[in-house]
Amino acid sequence: MPLTKYKAAAVTSEPAWFNLEAGVQKTIDFINEAGQAGCKLIAFPEVWIPGYPYWMWKINYQQSLPMLKKYRENSMAVDSDEFRRIRRAARDNQIHVSLGFSEIDHATLYLAQALISPTGEVLNHRRKIKPTHVEKLVYGDGAGDTFTSVVPTELGRLGQLNCWENMNPFLKALNVSAGEQIHIAAWPVYPGKETLKYPDPATNVADPASDLVTPAYAIETGTWTLAPFQRLSAEGLKMNTPEGVEPETDPTTYNGHARIYRPDGSLVVKPDKDFDGLLFVDIDLNECHLTKALADFSGHYMRPDLIRLLVDTRRKELVTEAEGNDGVKAYSTRERLGLNLPLDGSKEDEKVPVAL
C-alpha cells in the first residue's frame, strides 16, 4: 500500500551553468536538504543539469557553437559515476528523486528525466518525445521505450513530463489512463510576459506555463502537481550570452515561476521573485478521491468504445537483428544503459524490476 500522507519539495533555483560537477554537487545538496526536512519526494526542473540552454532562442548558429560545445561536454550519461552519486544520495536520504538533465548517449543529447527510488534504483528513465522549436538544434527525440511517464511507487502512481509535454493532450491522456496521482511538471527557465513582443504568442513565456498549463494539468488529471522551475541571476545571464553580444542585466522576468497545485487545480504555493530554494507541500493522496469522483478520464468519465489512444512503446533501432519467424530482435534502452542493474552490484546480485 502506498503512503497517503507525506511531505514533498519542488526546486526553484539557478543551475550550475555549463558545469557538470558543480551541478551534481548542487543536486546532492538539495537532496540532502529535502531529506533533512523529512521529504519523501524532491522534484527538479527540466534539464537542471547542466541548465536549460535558453541562449539557443536568442542567438544565431555561429554564436551558439562555443556554448553548444561546452554544453555537450557537461551533459550527463546515465551510466556515469556522476549519475550514480545522485542515486546514492537518494538512497542515503531515503527519498524519491525526480531529476531532469541533459542526457548524452553516444553523440546525441536528450531532454531526460529519471525517477530514482529511496533505494537508489531507477524506477523510470524517460526522454522528451519531441524537442520544442529551436531545442531541435540541441536535442534528439525520445524513443518508444523512453517516453512512458507514470510508474507505481510507495508514494502512489507518479508521473513526469517536460515543459510543453504538460500541455500535450495525448500525453495527458496516457498519464490519466495509468491512474496518475502525483505529477512532476518540470519546466526550464524562460522569461515572463513583460518580454512579449508582437507577434510572439503568450504560449512562449513563463506565465501561462505556471498559471494556466500547470493548474489545468492538475484539475484535468486530478493529481497533485509539482512544477519546479529554473531561475537566473545577472551572472547567469552573462554566462548564457556569447562573446561580442551585450547581455541582459535584469534577470527578474525569469524568476518566480515555480508552483505547486492541488488535485482540484488550486494553488498551494508560489515563490517570490527573489526566492531560491525548495518549495514544500504536504501531500494527502486522499484529496484525489473527490476530484476523480467528479471526473475520472480513465474510468467512469470516458468512453473508450468511442475514443482510444494507440501507443507504441517499442524501440526502433537503426540497425536491427533478425530473429526466427521473420521477426526482429527487441531492444531496450534501459538494459543497454544498465539501468536494470542494482546501484552497487552486478547482474548476479539481483534484477531491478523494469518500470511498467
Curated annotation (Swiss-Prot):
InterPro entries: C-N_Hydrolase, C-N_Hydrolase_sf, CN_hydrolase, Nitrilase/CN_hydratase_CS, Nitrilases_CHs. Keywords: Hydrolase, Lyase. Disulfide bonds: none annotated. Gene3D superfamilies: Carbon-nitrogen hydrolase. The active site is at 46 (proton acceptor), 128, 163 (nucleophile). It catalyses: formamide = hydrogen cyanide + H2O. GO terms for biological process: cyanide catabolic process. Its EC number is 4.2.1.66. One of its GO terms (molecular function) is cyanide hydratase activity. It holds the Pfam family CN_hydrolase. Induction: By cyanide and propionitrile. The keyword Lyase applies. Residues 6-285 form the CN hydrolase domain. The keyword Hydrolase applies. Belongs to the carbon-nitrogen hydrolase superfamily. Nitrilase family. Catalyzes the hydration of cyanide to formamide. Degradation of cyanide may be important for plant pathogenic fungi in infection of cyanogenic plants. Oligomer of dimers, forming left-handed helical fibers. This is Cyanide hydratase. It comes from Leptosphaeria maculans (Blackleg fungus). The lineage of its organism: Eukaryota, Fungi, Dikarya, Ascomycota, Pezizomycotina. The gene is Cht.
